[in-house]
């Protein structure tokens, strides 16, 4: 195509025809496109990858608080990060999950209670609470204490150890499986560092693999506070054997009983937003798609998308914001600062009003090994923003108003996305008009051996490389390994210059992707050897594998129209004029 604004495709399978009528040439293409166009940007030996997502796209079913206590104290603990305002240290943990892999090593039966160790937030009112409202999580806080089974004050009997008789072993009326407790057989224990990571001070775990909705997650953990040891749940080596064997006087086995561990339930196989464990799933962590994050060349910003993306919010007309935010008007405060992600300088030292950049603090604002972004508020776009925008002068009623969806001003009603935390992701679509906060950024991945362009068996001739807008020459500035899908910069000056290098290419689609139909027609009329005009029509549409399209993967049907003209002529007087210029 004789145009720099519209580019054709290289990897096509179909029919091409070229017709000529006098000085008019018509080229038509009707084919299947078996490639995807993409581009990557590299700088200083590494690839710059971009990410963007809206706030509804939190990383669900992967990050969990260990107790309501840790959730309730999370905001306060990180109010003055990087200092963490608590003296808790989790020293031991076991994480158990539904065994989908049929693994036979490190497996146990368990019965898990959502109210185990809790005091202030109880799902079943029949649970007898003995600990104070602000007590640290501990087995002895209520009647579900596994160390007191069958004794005075216990609401459990020994029958709770047998999966077949769990319900009979619970003396609390109206105690329902799937809500108040879950029982599982042959569950597997996850390996710390390989299958999950633990934040030992803030009290949450991050799984490497997202759980399915019907999978169950439970834990036992031990921690210290000022030298005092607390424990929630039972460990596999706490003296509760996996099996009990009864033998008669003749030495014959008369009965074999499998003993279940009593654990703290973090996720049930039934999703119920009205149950306390719904709040244990963290909804303030987002996935960048990176395997490893480093502070070098990492950028992140938060935007509000209305007529155009801006990094601040403005008051609704006729309803000015109330109090300033830390001495500055809210409308003049960047969203990074407003959401407590910019209070440090590059060296992670506190700085008044921040430095304008995202605070990269491993374990607090990022989980580097998994490429996660972590907000320092449990509900940054919910309760936290509700409090920031409150202007009725009575902060004591905020909790009640927020829970009852009672807004005191139009700014709260416009910006607070409370349904994001009170309902499932799907149900949160009922307020999709509030899903306007967007997180954008970029990270630098290791350069390694060449620049990976995201595919294998790249069609020859489809790679285009530019440096700072200048088109590079293959074989002179770079080489391409089309089989491995890598570009190698051979100009040492370019490598050392840190000029952004953009690689655009097409990679052959793998089996099973949506079928793409590529149709195009290009008409050119040549008036003379110096003057050509043309018009182009291109259409690309996809046919999905199934009639039901996935969210964010909807089939496309895009059309491009273009017009171009090309005029060339020799201008000798310009050459003579340039020749007269002094050297």
Q: What residues fall within each predicted segment?
A:
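Surface-exposed, low-hydrophobicity segments enriched in Gly/Pro/acidic/Ser residues
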Residues: 1-583
